[in-house]
């Protein structure tokens, strides 16, 4: 027989809110320090593959509006932070593949130019109506990648669409998910999201910098990363302008996409920006040096990335920017 007190304790434990983010103070199952370099090497190898695979069509549908929509949906659905970044990348990849194939099909058809134009207008209208469904499918897939047990169910996606004014059936939700997966060749994304790179570097930093306020830093890191994802093109254009000056205008889209594919650079820039906001430039410089040692990203590149992020954030605040939060 179980004691009543034990049952009550178990019930209260089940009702406790689950921690969806990383716990940097919990060292259970952590890699020992002598394996940190091995894990960084794994991330570096994946990072190099992603840079090599980058092309001019990456991030075409990664716009401020699509990022804000997906981020808002994930927030209201109370999904883990990592899901929204994966969902946005999946959605962008799917839309690029879908639109390019549809365009190729129309272009190679034997219709007259007028018929092709009419058919393409019809396709654009259909794609526009289905954008919300495709975004929810991308979120559903991303939630399964993070934790299948806690992923969005078909019923939840259907209810969410109904709340937004779309009367899709459960069968339509399933077909959409399969459509997204098949279009991206059943490869949702690289194994690690940008947040994994940030979390890994920050975890190693935390072991050396014990005085760092983990919760405060992580909150700022997530805010900064959200800003970067929402204002993606603006941040990288500013960074290239900082690096190349007037010559930045001749940078091709493919070259820009290769820079955007470097998630170690992104991770370092985000962490340094967060440290600059919290502890000022002196601490940010020290963290920059440590991140350079861990990631092999040049010091100047990390600085240029963080400066571009700060410039973008200040610019988004309007002409009367409140920069008091950034300690010089």
Predicted regions and their residues:
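Acidic, serine/threonine-rich low-complexity regulatory regions at protein termini
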Residues: 1-328
């Amino acid at each position: 027989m179980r004691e009543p007190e034990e049952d009550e304790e178990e019930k209260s434990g089940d009702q406790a809110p689950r921690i969806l983010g990383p716990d940097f103070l919990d060292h259970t199952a952590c890699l020992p320090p002598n394996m940190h370099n091995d894990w960084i090497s794994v991330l570096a190898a994946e990072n190099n593959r992603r840079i090599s695979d980058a092309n001019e069509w990456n991030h075409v549908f990664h716009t401020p509006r699509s990022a804000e929509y997906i981020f808002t949906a994930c927030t209201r659905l109370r999904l883990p932070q990592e899901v929204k970044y994966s969902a946005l990348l999946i959605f962008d990849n799917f839309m690029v593949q879908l639109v390019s194939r549809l365009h190729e099909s129309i272009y190679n058809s034997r219709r007259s130019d007028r018929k092709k134009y009419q058919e393409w207008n019809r396709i654009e209208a259909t794609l526009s109506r289905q954008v919300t469904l495709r975004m929810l499918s991308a979120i559903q897939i991303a939630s399964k990648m993070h934790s299948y047990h806690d992923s969005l169910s078909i019923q939840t996606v259907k209810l969410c669409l109904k709340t937004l004014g779309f009367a899709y059936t459960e069968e339509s939700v399933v077909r959409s998910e399969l459509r997204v997966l098949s279009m991206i060749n059943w490869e949702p994304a690289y194994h690690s999201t940008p947040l994994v790179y940030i979390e890994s570097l920050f975890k190693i930093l935390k072991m050396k910098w014990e005085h760092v306020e983990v919760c405060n830093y992580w909150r700022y890191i997530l805010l900064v990363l959200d800003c970067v994802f929402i204002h993606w093109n603006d941040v990288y254009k500013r960074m290239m302008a900082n690096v190349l000056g007037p010559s930045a205008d001749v940078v091709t889209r493919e070259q820009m996409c290769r820079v955007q594919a470097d998630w170690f650079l992104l991770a370092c820039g985000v962490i340094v920006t967060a440290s600059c906001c919290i502890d000022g430039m002196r601490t940010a410089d020290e963290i920059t040096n440590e991140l350079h040692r861990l990631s092999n990203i040049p010091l100047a590149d990390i600085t240029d990335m963080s400066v571009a992020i700060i410039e973008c954030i200040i610019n988004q605040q309007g002409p009367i920017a409140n920069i008091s939060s950034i300690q010089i």
